[in-house]
């Protein structure tokens, strides 16, 4: 992937963010997601590449666009695999809450783990703690290690955890160490990536979230040099979600076996979830969040705030883009 393609990848998430932001705060999460999907696919199909969706909106019979296995792009040029979430945090967008964004990971062919639509136990931490914290250790042990790596007392650490019933015991354990909890209602990708940057006030992400988003987070953290591990969750008793009300542990294990996953308890490192030679992460804010602002609509323009990370040349770019409207008369700098 060259610099031109990386710029075009940035434009993919910008267009998706703008599209879904038109419905931000209107309580229409499915409609906002559909607009983002359409905008993302439209921009992808304008790019000279042989693109393929490996993580998308669902299986081919479940999603009309950006389904798993769908080919995107013009059909000529480099082969690129994509893991996409056109509107991460649909509820956040629908109710104009912080943290919704359009996001994707891209890599050369075969460079992204084809994660099943399961849940995943995740651990994200700053580069200083890479390889020292471990998802197999208790939260108490990891907070002690994190404290030593960052030179901060436990009560100076902030741990992000999704606000779910399944995390009740985890939250109790974290609080017993003295560390602070920052609960989030949806969308853990931005929280995971924030752990890779100093000064965000976010030091660690713990808990269970969606597996596909784990791959996207891993791509970003690999490029940042941060720590990310994931472990698939297949037991409904652990996931504790109504979405799995009709599923069984045995049935989920059988499904994983059908997908070729022979070790369902394997702990995946970031370099295994995003193993490509060249890995790119791109995200654009729909609503304001930890890392960037959301879309701003003005009289003569629309403003987007985005982030793109590439391991090709170890770059991380925060980009504020002004999308001028036809006939624009005056554009303010800020």
UniProtKB/Swiss-Prot annotation:
What are the GO BP annotations of this UniProt entry? fructose 1,6-bisphosphate metabolic process; gluconeogenesis; glycerol metabolic process; reductive pentose-phosphate cycle
What EC number(s) does this enzyme carry? 3.1.3.11, 3.1.3.37
Q: Which residues bind Mn(2+) 1?
A: 33, 57
Binding of Mn(2+) 2 occurs at 85, 88, 213
Reply yes or no: does the keyword Metal-binding apply.
yes
Query: What is a single molecular function from GO for this protein?
Result: metal ion binding
**Annotated residues for binding of substrate:** 88-90, 119, 164-166, 186-188
Q: In which pathway does it act?
A: Carbohydrate biosynthesis; Calvin cycle
Q: Which GO terms describe its cellular component?
A: cytosol
Which InterPro entries has this protein been placed in? Answer: FBPase_class-2/SBPase
* Cofactor(s) required for function per UniProt: Mn(2+)
Top EC class, one word: hydrolase
What keywords does the record list, in alphabetical order?
Calvin cycle, Carbohydrate metabolism, Hydrolase, Manganese, Metal-binding
Q: Which family does it belong to?
A: Belongs to the FBPase class 2 family.
How is this protein organized at the quaternary level? Homotetramer.
Cite the PANTHER family for this sequence. Answer: FRUCTOSE-1,6-BISPHOSPHATASE 1 CLASS 2-RELATED (PTHR30447:SF0), FRUCTOSE-1,6-BISPHOSPHATASE CLASS 2 (PTHR30447)
Give the function comment from the record: Catalyzes the hydrolysis of fructose 1,6-bisphosphate (Fru 1,6-P2) and sedoheptulose 1,7-bisphosphate (Sed 1,7-P2) to fructose 6-phosphate and sedoheptulose 7-phosphate, respectively.
UniProt name for this protein: D-fructose 1,6-bisphosphatase class 2/sedoheptulose 1,7-bisphosphatase
| Species of the source | Synechococcus sp. (strain CC9311)
């Amino acid at each position: 992937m060259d610099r031109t393609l990386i710029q075009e990848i940035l434009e993919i998430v910008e267009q998706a963010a703008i599209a879904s932001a038109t419905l931000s705060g209107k309580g229409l999460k499915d409609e906002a997601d559909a607009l983002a999907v359409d905008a993302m696919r439209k921009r992808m199909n304008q790019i000279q590449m042989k693109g393929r969706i490996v993580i998308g909106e669902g299986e081919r019979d479940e999603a009309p666009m950006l389904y798993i296995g769908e080919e995107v792009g013009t059909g000529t040029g480099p082969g690129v695999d994509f893991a996409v979430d056109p509107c991460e945090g649909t509820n956040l967008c629908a109710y104009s809450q912080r943290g919704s964004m359009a996001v994707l990971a891209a890599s050369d062919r075969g460079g992204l783990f084809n994660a099943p639509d399961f849940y995943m136990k995740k651990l994200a931490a700053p580069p200083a703690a890479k390889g020292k914290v471990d998802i197999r250790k208790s939260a108490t042990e990891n907070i002690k290690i994190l404290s030593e790596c960052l030179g901060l007392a436990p009560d100076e650490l902030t741990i992000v955890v999704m606000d779910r019933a399944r995390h009740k015991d985890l939250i109790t354990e974290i609080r017993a160490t003295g560390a602070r909890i920052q609960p989030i209602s949806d969308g853990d990708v931005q929280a995971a990536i924030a752990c890779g940057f100093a000064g965000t006030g976010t030091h660690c992400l713990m808990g269970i979230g969606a597996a596909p988003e784990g791959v996207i987070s891993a791509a970003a953290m690999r490029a940042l040099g941060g720590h990310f591990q994931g472990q698939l969750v297949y037991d409904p008793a652990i996931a504790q979600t109504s979405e799995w009300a009709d599923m069984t542990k045995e049935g989920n294990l059988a499904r994983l076996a059908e997908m070729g996953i022979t070790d369902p308890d394997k702990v995946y490192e970031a370099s295994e979830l995003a193993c490509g030679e060249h890995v790119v992460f791109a995200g654009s804010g729909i609503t304001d969040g930890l890392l960037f602002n959301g879309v701003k609509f003005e009289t003569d323009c629309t403003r987007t705030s985005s982030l793109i990370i590439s391991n090709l040349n170890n770059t991380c770019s925060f980009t504020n883009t002004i999308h001028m409207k036809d006939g624009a008369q005056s554009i303010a700098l800020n």
